[in-house]
Amino acid sequence: YYAEETLIGGYDLINEPVLPNGVSLEEFRQLYIDITDAIREVDNNHIVYIEGNWYGTDFSGLTPPWDDNMSYSFHKYWGETSLATIQSYISMSNQYDIPLWMGESGENSNQWYYEVFNLLEENNIGWNFWTHKKVEKISSPFSAVVTPQYQTLIDYWSGNGSQPSSAYAEAALISFANSLKLENCISRPGVLASLTDPDFGEVSKPYSDHSIPGIIPAAEYDIGAWGLSYTDSDYYNNGDGNYNDGWSFRNDGVDIEANSEDDEIPYTVGWTDAGEWLGYTIQNVTPGTYDLKIKIAAPASGGIFFAQLNGTNLAVIDVPNTGGWYDWQNVLIPNVEVSSGEQFLKIQIM
């Protein structure tokens, strides 16, 4: 059916195989050969992609190649981003003069994406990102919202709600299907930039259109690599667990929490550690002298942070006890002189 279809790149024969007990590597290889032979009876045009054992990571028993138009396809998740992590695949490719394809990777932070996918491209390895759209997640370029009607179905399925009528269930499913349309999804521009913007690792770019005078939400720090737009002590999952505590709005290590109590600022930054900082490029500037107010909340005193504008220290702030994590107070940095032109505001935890 697909033999003459040029829109089809090839056939990935088995996705993320894991050999059951009792199945040998020889049998595994022979299965791949048998499938390839069956394809070649009707199609000599398309690539066959061969994934290794253990979720596409182990190619033991699968060399040498058995077809002139095949590629070894590996997956990469939750590990370090160094060349050493893919060197065995590169060596296999060089030894047998066969192309590599990284068929699946994702489910991590923007910095991890940037480092991994640049590593692949530097070594001439094509790649595929998993995945372009998920449901209420920060780790994909687009995120679909669960509608209230569909949530009612979820509650019923999980045993936490009464059974809806069939008409309601059908309407709920349709509402969620509409929510999945790309035009109805939430965009995650930082994710897309980490994958496609060649400047991501070189230039800090504004997340949104900040102005002076104006309000700058803490969660709307710049888009860019770790060390350019922000720093965070835990900024990707290298196999030892999560990289985020808030799991809202942005996909960096910066820990952001949804703030349902404030429509003006729906997200807040928390779980901060010493040395972490956030940077904000401000392009719409009216020069003058301003008071800088920073809204904070803390259940105890003792925290310290400082603010810089274009590299000049503005003040060191001792964080007071405001009464709780959600009891907000403004701290004031008065008489800040702002010149014309683009500004860079930096807030750093001490």
Regions found by a protein language model. Name each.
Residues 112-210:
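Aromatic-rich peripheral "rim/lid" segments of glycoside hydrolase catalytic domains that contact
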Residues 194-350:
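Extracytoplasmic
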Residues 3, 63-64, 69-70, 81, ...:
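Alpha-helical protein-protein interaction elements
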Residues 1-2, 11, 32, 49, ...:
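Sequence-level detector for tyrosine residue identity
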Residues 15, 21, 44-45, 53, ...:
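Detector for Asparagine
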Residues 30, 87, 95, 111, ...:
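Residue-identity detector for glutamine
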Residues 56, 68, 103, 114, ...:
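Intrinsic disorder/low-complexity segments enriched in polar/charged and small flexible residues
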Residues 3-134, 139-155:
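Extracellular glycoside hydrolase catalytic/binding regions
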